[in-house]
């Protein structure tokens, strides 16, 4: 149940506030109501509020997100020194969907839709010179209505205007991230491969995953469009009845 207490700071004044269970390392998160509509608020924890380094990281996320508009990317609305206000998405993360509804991805059409939308939105970011650099199941929402992908959290992104990155998640980070090397489009592509590995029947994407997660960035796909081409043309791996893997062309 959402509280009816008021909450205010220099810019935002909300009709109701509910702190969410999932919190970040440096930010608290809230579901808030503004003019009768739900929004998502990310606010620096007290120990980081007022620290210019963390304020600039929030500013980078907001200024990057605010100029982008894609149906599978969460929308950014407003910024204060210590807070960001974004679209509230009624749904669950990919991690939660896999845990709560493990049968969802056993239907091929659901897997196809998820992969297509994920690739579409990452391709959109790259076309606007933005690297996400923290692609992972916890940063991908699936809406309760229509099960659409919503990519969230541009806090680690890299752009020409903001070349400094602020972190990554080791389990989905490319080798060049872990070693402090040069990042690029293949860095996000590595994470896409690791995300595909999380799907229950990921063996259908065996060839795609193998190329995405190559140790050498130059051996990976060099664009998301290349992945889309292979997925749409059916260049995947199929598990035959004897459970051996065979490379085939699958036509829908």
Question: How would you describe each model-predicted region?
Answer:
Residues 69-79:
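Conserved HxN/HPN-centered segment at the entrance to the catalytic loop
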Residues 94-106:
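AlphaC helix of the protein kinase catalytic domain
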């Amino acid at each position: 149940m959402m509280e009816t207490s008021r909450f205010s700071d220099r810019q935002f004044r909300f009709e109701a506030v509910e702190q969410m269970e999932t919190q970040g390392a440096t930010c608290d998160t809230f579901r808030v109501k503004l003019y009768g509509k739900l929004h998502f608020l990310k606010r620096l924890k007290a120990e980081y509020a007022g620290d210019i380094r963390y304020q600039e990281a929030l500013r980078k996320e907001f200024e990057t997100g605010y100029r982008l508009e894609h149906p599978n990317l969460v929308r950014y609305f407003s910024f204060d020194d210590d807070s960001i206000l974004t679209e509230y998405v009624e749904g669950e993360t990919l991690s939660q969907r896999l845990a709560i509804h493990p049968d969802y991805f056993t239907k091929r059409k659901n897997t196809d839709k998820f992969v297509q939308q994920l690739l579409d939105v990452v391709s959109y970011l790259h076309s606007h010179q933005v690297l996400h650099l923290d692609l992972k199941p916890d940063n991908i929402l699936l809406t309760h209505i229509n099960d659409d992908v919503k990519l969230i959290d541009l806090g680690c992104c890299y752009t020409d205007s903001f070349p400094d990155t602020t972190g990554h998640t080791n389990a989905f980070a490319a080798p060049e991230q872990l070693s402090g090397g040069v990042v690029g489009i293949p860095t996000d592509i590595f994470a896409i491969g690791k995300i595909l590995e999380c799907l229950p029947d990921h063996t259908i994407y065996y060839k795609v995953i193998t190329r995405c997660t190559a140790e050498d960035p130059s051996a990976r796909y060099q664009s998301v469009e290349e992945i889309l081409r292979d997925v749409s043309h059916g260049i995947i791996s199929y598990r035959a009845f004897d459970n051996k893997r065979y490379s085939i062309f699958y036509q829908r």
